[in-house]
Amino acid sequence: MSAPDKQQPPHGGGTGGGGGAGGQAMDPAAAGPTKAKKTNAGVRRPEKPPYSYIALIVMAIQSSPSKRLTLSEIYQFLQARFPFFRGAYQGWKNSVRHNLSLNECFIKLPKGLGRPGKGHYWTIDPASEFMFEEGSFRRRPRGFRRKCQALKPVYSMVNGLGFNHLPDTYGFQGSGGLSCAPNSLALEGGLGMMNGHLAGNVDGMALPSHSVPHLPSNGGHSYMGGCGGSAAGEYPHHDSSVPASPLLPAGAGGVMEPHAVYSSSAAAWPPAASAALNSGASYIKQQPLSPCNPAANPLSGSISTHSLEQPYLHQNSHNGPAELQGIPRYHSQSPSMCDRKEFVFSFNAMASSSMHTTGGGSYYHQQVTYQDIKPCVM
C-alpha cells in the first residue's frame, strides 16, 4: 500500500509539474504575438501629402532641369521628398503609373535610339501648363478639369467672320489691278458695300420707271478699305436713287441679302440686251461668275460679275423666256479663274436689321446650303 502511495505523488506531482511547465512554456508564446500586434498597431504610417498624384508628378517633373523624368526618377523624387512613400506600402506606385498614362497633361517622349534601358521620359503638355501656374498644387475640387477646359482659348470662327484666318487662296482680284489680301477686308460696322456694288452692277441697265432706293450703310462699311488700286472708279458709291435692273420689278423694294454681285464695270448694256431683258424669266440661276472672254460672250465686256454664291432672282413677270435666248445661261471664264474658290461669308444674322426695306413683291434670295463650281464652257 505504501508503494502505490509513494508512487502517486510523484506521478501526480509529475503531472502537475508537467502541466505547470507546459503552462509556463505556452504563456510566453501566446503573449509574444499579442505584444507584437500591439506594437504594430501603435506605429502609424506617415500622413499622405495633401496633393493629388497629378500635382506630385508635376512637382517631380518641374524639379528636373530638363523638365522630363523617367518613371523610376519620379519614384525617387517622391520617396526623397515625402516620408509617406518610404514605407512598406507600395500601392502608390500603381497610382503614379495610372495618372501618367490616363491624363492628357502628361506626354510620353519617344526613347532615343542610343539610350539604353526601357524607361521613357515623361514631360508636361505645354497646353496644360497653365493649370499649375504659381505652384497651385493643392487638390482640385470635383469638376476642375472641365472648368479648365472651358477656360482654354477658343479660336473657332463664329458665323464665318474670322478674317485673320482666311487662307491666301481667298485673295480676290478685280479687273483693273485691284487686289485685296484677306487681312485687308475691313469690317467697319455696316453693309455699305451693297451701295457701291449694286450701283455698279445696275448702272448700265437704265430704265426710267425702275429705281432702287439707296441702301443704308452703318458707319460707311466698305470691303475695299484696305485695297490698293482704282477702287473708286470700278466700285462707285451713289448717294441718290440709281436706275435699277429690269430684273427687279417697279415698286418692289424687296429684301436683298448681302451676298451681292460684284461688278467690275459700269458700262451701258447694249440696247438689244436691255430690250430682251425687259420681260425676264420666272427664275434665273446665276452661277459664280468671273471676268470672261469678250470674244465668246458679248455681255462679258460690259458686265463682268463675281457672284459670291448662287442667287435666285424671283420674278413676277408673266412673259415667256423666249426673249432671253440671246443671253447665255452660264458665263464662261478662263481656266485660271475657274479654279478659284468662292468668297463665302455668312452675314445673314448681321444684315437682317439693316438690309430690310419697305414694300413687297419680289426679293433677292441666295442659296447658302450648297455651292458648285461649273466647268468652263467657252
Swiss-Prot record:
CDD domains: FH_FOXF1. One of its GO terms (biological process) is positive regulation of cell migration. Keywords: Activator, DNA-binding, Nucleus, Transcription, Transcription regulation. Residues 11-23 have a biased composition (Gly residues). It comes from the Eukaryota. It is found in: Nucleus. InterPro entries: Fork_head_dom, Forkhead_box_regulator, TF_fork_head_CS_1, TF_fork_head_CS_2, WH-like_DNA-bd_sf, WH_DNA-bd_sf. Its main location: nucleus. Gene3D superfamilies: Winged helix-like DNA-binding domain superfamily/Winged helix DNA-binding domain. Residues 47-138 bind DNA. Expressed primarily in lung in alveolar type II pneumocyte cells, and to a lesser extent in placenta, stomach, intestine and colon. Coiled coil: none annotated. GO terms for cellular component: nucleoplasm; nucleus. Residues 1-45 are annotated as: Disordered. Residues 24-42 have a biased composition (Low complexity). GO terms for molecular function: DNA-binding transcription activator activity, RNA polymerase II-specific; RNA polymerase II cis-regulatory region sequence-specific DNA binding; transcription cis-regulatory region binding. Probable transcription activator for a number of lung-specific genes. Activation domains C-terminal of (and distinct from) the forkhead domains are necessary for transcriptional activation. This is Forkhead box protein F1. It comes from Mus musculus.
